[in-house]
């Protein structure tokens, strides 16, 4: 057996002696933080949703055995340490002492076992753990996982969307496969749920008995030593960009996400505000319906790619602000050094009108209409789709842009209802496993795509290979992505967000605002 004590796992992270000695979590205690968000969570039950809005809330309320740090590396959270067998088929976790739930009960291994078993049964993320045979309690501080086959278990256990949230065992028993609601939304996080009024607000209050992880000298990623400085954090759904801008300026909001780039010059001139660029943030891409009679033909897909000038698309999406986009072909962002790859890059950013004509002729295409669905909820998506449609139409591809609201677009895409191209964006994936739903045969977001070479490459990268071999296997996957085009990646879009200068200690993060270790100094 291989022991993974915290000293080994955390040696290069923010541990005692590794962070500045003068670090102080809170400049002041108390106050309230009002955060303007683009949308509201669909549920407070952390294991039931993969949406960004649900994840943004879950990380305040719940914790897992392990999580990701600032550098996309797995770190312990509720786990004190773990042991992995030599064959990779057994993991034994020892839990931290004295962890309290929001209802005052102390966490034990039974809570972990019950929560994980429920996740494996009802969560849309359960597919990450198809090779988990069992999870069982050994003693009050020890949990054992037995695997059917070796796979990147820790990486998948740390993924926060949906998170493998730990609930009290009695709550799990009460709800089973039903949605946990109301006062039973109980976790171990630094904030607890006050109230949720769908489409109005999510209110969270400081959990006074939160057990800070003293192995760290400060927060990192989704974990580390987290401290609730503000008494209350409120997430307010404000879908209108103009309303988020106005509220930030007037002080109704202390924070606003996804600000329109067109408002940035005005906001940057306001000394009461601080505007940040969230980088990385989104990969702009289009998904393809591989059941469509034209999109299903590889020469047609290659023609779509050969007609694209990504620089022009990204300029349109960012209103010409070069600091808000990046032309690059990797599915993982350059900041994610473990997975960044330029495999297949020769197919990217190589527009050629003659090549497009040859490929369309090979596909037998004669100007038949192709429905391209998009939305205006995300201005960068809309601008990108307009520019893409113009490039394709100029190249002789008869795309018909169809506008709808974002929820309707998602529903139509999932129902595979009369469309060929779907404008979308991907937030940062933390592990190759998170790409399976878009690349693997039979998965919901692959939209009919199936390639046996891809199946083999995906199986390899999602096996229990050492990290360096997994990286090589991932490069094979990306090579096939660019050779076969299950999706078409355009480039990176970075997003502006803003805070009032009365918020002290706030640090932007690529998937969600983090208001732990943030002080509200407004009187």
Model-derived features: positions:
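Extracytoplasmic/peripheral linker and loop segments enriched in polar/acidic and small residues
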Residues: 347-349, 398-409, 417, 435-501, ...
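Structural transition elements
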Residues: 191, 323-362, 378-383
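Aromatic- and charge-enriched surface segment that lines or borders ligand/interaction sites
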Residues: 80-125, 138, 144-146, 247, ...
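Surface-exposed binding/hinge segments that line
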Residues: 23, 28, 94, 127-173, ...
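N-terminal lobe/hinge region of extracytoplasmic solute-binding protein
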Residues: 36-86, 111, 117, 498
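Periplasmic binding protein-like
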Residues: 35, 104, 384, 390-441, ...
């Amino acid at each position: 057996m291989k022991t993974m004590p915290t000293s080994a796992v955390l040696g290069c992270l923010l541990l005692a002696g590794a962070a500045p000695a003068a670090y102080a979590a809170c400049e002041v205690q108390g106050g309230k933080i009002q955060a303007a968000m683009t949308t509201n969570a669909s549920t407070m039950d952390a294991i039931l949703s993969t949406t960004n809005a649900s994840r943004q809330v879950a990380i305040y309320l719940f914790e897992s055995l392990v999580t990701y740090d600032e550098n996309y590396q797995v770190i312990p959270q509720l786990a004190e340490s773990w042991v992995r067998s030599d064959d990779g088929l057994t993991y034994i976790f020892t839990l931290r002492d004295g962890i309290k739930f929001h209802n005052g009960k102390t966490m034990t291994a039974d809570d972990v076992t019950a929560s994980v078993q429920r996740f494996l049964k009802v969560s849309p993320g359960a597919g990450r753990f198809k090779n988990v045979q069992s999870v069982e309690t050994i003693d009050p501080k020890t949990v054992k996982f037995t695997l059917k086959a070796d796979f990147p278990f820790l990486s998948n256990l740390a993924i926060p969307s949906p998170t493998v949230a730990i609930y009290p065992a009695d709550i799990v028993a009460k709800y089973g496969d039903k949605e946990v609601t109301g006062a039973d939304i109980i976790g171990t996080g630094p904030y607890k749920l006050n109230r949720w009024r769908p489409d109005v607000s999510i209110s969270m209050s400081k959990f006074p008995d939160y057990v800070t992880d003293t192995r760290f000298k400060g927060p990192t990623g989704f974990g580390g030593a987290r401290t609730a400085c503000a008494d209350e954090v409120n997430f307010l759904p404000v879908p209108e960009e103009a309303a988020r801008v106005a509220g930030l300026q007037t002080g109704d909001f202390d924070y606003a996400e996804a600000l329109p780039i067109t408002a940035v010059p005005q906001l940057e001139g306001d000394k009461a505000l601080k505007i940040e660029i969230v980088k990385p943030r989104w990969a702009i891409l289009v998904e393809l319906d591989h059941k469509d009679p034209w999109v299903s033909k590889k020469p047609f897909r290659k023609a779509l790619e050969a007609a694209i000038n990504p620089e022009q698309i990204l300029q349109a999406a960012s209103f010409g602000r070069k600091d808000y986009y990046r032309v690059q072909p990797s599915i993982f962002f350059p900041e994610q050094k473990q997975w960044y790859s330029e495999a297949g890059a020769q197919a990217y950013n190589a527009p050629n009108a003659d090549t497009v004509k040859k490929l369309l002729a090979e596909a037998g295409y004669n100007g038949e209409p192709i429905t391209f669905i998009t939305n205006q909820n995300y201005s960068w998506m809309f601008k990108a789709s307009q520019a893409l449609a113009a490039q394709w139409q100029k190249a002789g591809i008869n795309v018909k842009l169809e506008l709808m609201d974002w929820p309707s677009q998602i529903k139509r895409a999932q129902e595979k209802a009369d469309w060929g191209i779907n404008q979308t964006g991907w937030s940062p994936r933390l592990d190759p496993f998170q790409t399976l739903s878009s690349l693997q045969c039979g998965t919901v977001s692959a939209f009919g795509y199936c390639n046996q070479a891809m199946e083999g490459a995906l199986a390899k990268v999602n096996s229990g290979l050492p990290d360096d071999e997994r990286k090589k296997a991932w490069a094979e996957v990306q090579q096939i992505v660019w050779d076969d085009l299950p999706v078409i990646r355009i480039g990176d879009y970075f997003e502006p967000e803003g805070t009032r200068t009365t918020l002290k200690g706030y640090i932007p993060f690529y998937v969600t605002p983090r208001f732990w270790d943030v002080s509200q100094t407004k009187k």
